[in-house]
Amino acid sequence: IAEPGFPSSDFDGELQLLLQEMGKNPPYDVYLIPSGTQLFGMKGGNKEAMSFMETLDTTRAYNRSNVNFLPKQVKLFSDGAIYSQLMQMKDGYTDGHHGEWMTPLSLFEEQLMMYWNNDYKIHVHANGDLGQQMVIDLVQKAQNINPKQDHRLTLHHMGYFDKPMAEKMKNLGIGI
């Protein structure tokens, strides 16, 4: 089982609960990908979050035989969820409400560029076509500044997108 985006709110509490449950030796392993968004707030900044992440896969207190943090991977969050209708949509919503950015755009760009430039595999929660377009545009910018052949950036969830966006994702090497 993979949990991209760990923790959701309380690193120590969630980890202790997970380790306690996994101590019962269920017939599966758990692989964790840290949340750059949550750790930004918990650690007081992007550099502090990344420094903490650098210790996760090698610190025994955070790993067990069946629980492991994946090295050099991070989950970032673009726009809101499908079911809550908080995705960012290019054409908006018919009832006039607006989607939400889960991470302010300037912070998201700072995070994506920092992890990109430090050779992380980046996973991005993105649902609406505007949220995904923002990620596509930033990956293009990152490729222009610091080109990578096999960056393996991956979009998760993919609520709404069109064929031209899919082609652009393919051309940029974005996984879906």
Predicted regions and their residues:
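C-terminal active-site-proximal or functional interface alpha/beta core segments in diverse enzymes
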Residues: 144-176
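Short catalytic-loop micro-motif centered on adjacent basic/acidic residues
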Residues: 1-4, 121-126, 153-156
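Metal-coordinating catalytic core of metallo-dependent amide/deamination hydrolases
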Residues: 9-129, 133, 166-175
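Polar interaction faces of repeat-based domains
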Residues: 133, 137-147
